[in-house]
């Protein structure tokens, strides 16, 4: 059994850790998988979401990908595409839908700073409603098997904790350098295990890990944080930019390997 686990982990790393030097837009343009933009009715709002399907002969589990505070960028869409490459239906909702100038979405903001400012003003209830409707959409697709995992990056990591706490029968949650709950109210309703991925040089976020661990343990929840030495905040994205630091690149590869292994275990 141990040899089998090691073999699966090694294979998944080979599949998930290969570096593509092309930019996100070029990678998306050449994907062989079916991807599409969809609009979802979210309590009277129009929620835009990016969906990618695996090339598979069986029903697949789904992963809800929650973007950073920059909004639904091309990089986040490449994460969804990579998950589909590994056999999952991935949905990445644009939580800035309707918030850009003229009611646009992330791509309609003049700068990433403008997107960050808009994200800071999003009502929490609206974000949770949008996530719930995106989850409902992907779960009820004919090619979905009903299982759902959630993953979020930075701001999206914090929202991953929030959404898991809303209790929506989530198989597992994956938090990439996002802050977590500090009390019973933020942890008591969490569904499924939560796995954390943190850069060792990201003390602003890491200083909250012990408090989150205590809140999770008090409420009988599974929380497994992993810290990658020397890596900074947003290492998953920064490792794919030109000339990444060795620490970020190593953390990126190890985190992808761990993530895919954990997803494989619940599929």
PLM region spans:
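Bacterial signal peptide processing site
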Residues: 18-20
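Primarily recognizes the serine-hydrolase "nucleophile elbow" in alpha/beta-hydrolase
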Residues: 131-191
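Acidic catalytic loop of the alpha/beta-hydrolase fold
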Residues: 201-206
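C-terminal catalytic histidine-bearing segment of alpha/beta-hydrolase fold enzymes
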Residues: 217-267
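Short, proline-enriched alpha-helix->beta-strand connector loops that line the catalytic pocket
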Residues: 189-194, 219-222
């Amino acid at each position: 059994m141990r040899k089998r686990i090691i073999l699966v982990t090694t294979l998944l790393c080979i599949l998930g850790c290969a570096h593509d030097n092309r930019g996100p837009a070029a990678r998306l343009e050449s994907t062989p998988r079916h991807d599409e933009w969809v609009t979802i009715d979210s309590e009277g709002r129009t929620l835009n979401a990016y969906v990618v399907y695996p090339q598979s002969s069986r029903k697949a589990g789904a992963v809800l990908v929650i973007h950073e505070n920059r909004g639904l960028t091309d990089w986040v869409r490449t994460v969804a595409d990579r998950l589909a490459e590994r056999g999952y239906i991935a949905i990445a909702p644009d939580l800035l839908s309707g918030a850009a100038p003229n009611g646009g979405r992330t791509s309609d903001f003049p700068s990433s700073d403008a997107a960050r400012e808009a994200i800071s003003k999003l009502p929490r209830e609206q974000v949770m409603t949008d996530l719930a409707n995106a989850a409902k959409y992907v779960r009820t697709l004919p090619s979905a098997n009903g299982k759902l995992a959630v993953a979020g990056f930075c701001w999206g990591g914090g929202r991953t904790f929030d959404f898991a706490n809303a209790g929506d029968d989530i198989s597992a949650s994956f938090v990439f350098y996002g802050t977590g709950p500090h009390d019973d109210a933020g942890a008591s309703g969490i569904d499924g295990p939560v796995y954390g991925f943190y850069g060792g040089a990201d003390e602003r976020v890491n200083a909250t890990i012990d408090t989150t661990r205590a809140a999770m343990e008090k409420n009988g929840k599974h929380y497994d944080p992993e810290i990658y030495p020397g890596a900074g905040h947003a290492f998953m994205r920064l490792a794919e930019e030109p000339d990444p630091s060795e620490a970020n690149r190593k953390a990126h590869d190890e985190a992808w390997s761990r993530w895919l292994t954990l997803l494989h275990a619940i599929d």
